[in-house]
Design a protein with these regions (language model features):
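Hydrophobic transmembrane alpha-helices and immediately adjacent juxtamembrane helices
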Residues: 1-292
Length: 292
């Protein structure tokens, strides 16, 4: 933690900034993070540069990735498996779920290796370590904005062709839902990042785990499909990503299963994951250079 000090000592003995170790379990200086907002912006720009450096299509992959995935979902789950889509066009159904899920998955995957991939930088200069994962989720937020714009273009096409889709009042909740998804991704990501300093296997397992998590979420199937399997439906509802996905579909397609229990549970889980993640991150950052 850094703090500004005003002293009357001679210039050769004066310090403008003193770095002291953190002592509390939840010792996060929000004012300090705000003072380093320019650094966060620089990290966001760097993330884009590193991600698409030496690629032929560059940032076009932001659009191509979810678009290709949606087409595959539509062919495999909609065509071959003939899964229901609650009466809305399958392409939009899968794109809606995939857009929300991709945002969450990017937040988790991009923050999961914060300590390991930035150990050299952390060992050379001081700055709030939490700026790194924050910059990663902000990068994911920008990607989501671009993908959401693409989704709206396809939505407009299907709306114009009389597909029966419509926006509902739930659309007003979308900014808050996406904020929740971002905070959940940040919380889970920094938990994994903190644990990978000692258990490197997690860095490999997190990608696989996120993929499995997707199939436990109503991305390729509607929650209503599980009405005849009450126990399985309850298990899926215990997934904190179920409520955000269903709300997004309800908001933009007019179909979905939104419950008070699902909303409250998802919010509580997100808050718990974020608090636990920040506490763990704060404790690990003191000693991670000895284990990385």
């Amino acid at each position: 933690m850094a703090e500004n000090l005003q002293t009357t000592r001679p210039a050769e003995e004066s310090w403008t900034t003193v770095i002291r170790p953190k002592t509390g379990w939840f010792d996060i200086d929000l004012n300090e993070l705000w003072r380093y907002r320019d650094l966060i912006t620089m990290f966001v720009k760097r993330n884009f540069t590193v991600l698409y450096k030496q690629t032929i299509l560059g940032p076009a992959w932001i659009i191509l990735n979810p678009l290709i995935t949606t087409i595959i979902f539509n062919v495999v789950f909609g065509g071959m498996a003939n899964m229901p889509t609650d009466g809305v066009p399958g392409f939009l159904f899968y794109m809606a779920g995939n857009t929300v899920w991709t945002f969450f998955a990017n937040c988790v995957n991009n923050t999961a290796n914060t300590f390991v991939t930035n150990s050299q930088v952390f060992g050379k200069v001081y700055f709030p370590r939490l700026t790194m994962p924050i910059s990663q989720v902000l990068t994911s937020l920008i990607n989501f904005g671009i993908q959401a714009a693409m989704y709206l273009i396809f939505w407009g096409y299907f709306f114009a062709t009389g597909s029966g889709i419509t926006f509902t009042l739930w659309a007003l909740a979308i900014p808050f839902v996406m904020l929740e998804v971002m905070l959940l991704g940040l919380g889970v990501g920094i938990i994994v990042s903190s644990l990978t300093t000692k258990y490197r296997d997690l860095a490999i397992a997190v990608g696989f785990g996120v993929q499995l998590w997707m199939y436990a979420s109503p991305v390729v199937y509607p929650l209503s499909m599980l009405d005849n399997s009450p126990r399985l439906k309850v298990l899926v509802q215990l997934n904190p990503m179920t409520s955000p996905i269903e709300i997004f579909r309800m908001a933009t397609l007019g179909t979905g299963t939104v419950t008070v229990f699902g909303i409250v549970y998802s919010l509580i889980f997100t808050a718990a994951a974020l608090v636990f993640g920040v506490v763990l991150f704060s404790r690990i950052e003191k000693t991670f250079m000895d284990t990385v």
